[in-house]
Amino acid sequence: MSGRELRHGYTTGACAAAAAAGAARMLRRQELADEAEIVLPRGERVAFRLHGQEFTETWATCHVVKDAGDDPDVTNGAEIHATVRREALNRPGARTMVFVTGGRGVGTITKPGLAVPVGEPAINPVPMRMITEAVKAEFSVVCLPQILTVTVSIPNGEELAKKTLNARLGIVGGLSILGTTGIVRPISAKAWTDTLDAAIDVALACGCRTLVLSTGRTSELVVQGALAGEHLREEACVMMGDHVGYALRACARKGAEQAVLAGQFAKLLKIACGHEQTHVSSSELDLRLLAEWIAATPAASHLASLVEGANTARQVLEASGNDPALMELVCSRAREAARLLAPSLRIKVLLAGYDSTVLYFG
């Protein structure tokens, strides 16, 4: 690899949790706070600088300026605000409750198929949990039960959302509060391909002839668990991200014998559709092609109606009840698409469920 190592950043979810933690701290202690520390989903402790701090006896507010590191993220520099309000809960046996809602610049879900129900603010489950836990932790030492309401807002979120695919997905009025790890990894193409080359070289040098190419950290963890009994070496796991075509060709060029493609349904469907680059800026998922495949496959014909009204690939999979015919159809086509990109490689495909289980491997 050449050049400096790219700097990682933090997700909107991590920033929202930090802002909520800071506001909760000021509200409870009735004093200004300059920073707030939160625990990310994988256990890392990170401190965020706070801005715009205000508090009274009943509410407090502040914001965190999102730093996406060297990732070309449209939300880089955005102000992620959180306001925490409290009211006493005068009921015998009551416990403190935390409610999280979206304010100005946070979108609302209007179509099914996403991780958040229709009508709810576009705050994904992991950030929602991070925000709730951060506020609960601050008030855990308070004996008097209270109702704590957290409002997350992004002042220019509606304008920024126009630069994303949110509207197409049915997220209206603003941005989504996202993140599963709290950390944004840079997606610079040169950085990724340099990293891929180095990782593949290391794996082969360690004697690995089967390499696991994952689209993200979640699918990587799933495949590591699934293949734990096969003495899978850590070096064999290569996070290819969205660079499917490059990773497969590099494996073949460098002498690997087999590759296991590991990803969730939407990513594998993109691979099946022939996309060598699966990032949203480079590839659009057209469910009409999936509908054509289903129509041409007798074993999957019962799934046709599910695709007609679907908004996302995830919605199709979940509505099918993880139907084996659907998974076989998409995974087999992903496998064939991968073979076209790297004919010398033996290819297997692992479909990681949205609940981190193995849905298909073959």
From Swiss-Prot:
Database matches in PANTHER family: COBALT-PRECORRIN-5B C(1)-METHYLTRANSFERASE
Group of enzyme by EC: transferase
InterPro entries: CbiD (IPR002748), CbiD_sf (IPR036074)
An example Gene Ontology molecular-function term: cobalt-precorrin-5B C1-methyltransferase activity
The gene coding this protein: cbiD
Keywords linked to the UniProt accession: Cobalamin biosynthesis, Methyltransferase, S-adenosyl-L-methionine, Transferase
Pfam families: CbiD (PF01888)
Protein name in the entry: Cobalt-precorrin-5B C(1)-methyltransferase
Organism: Geobacter sulfurreducens (strain ATCC 51573 / DSM 12127 / PCA)
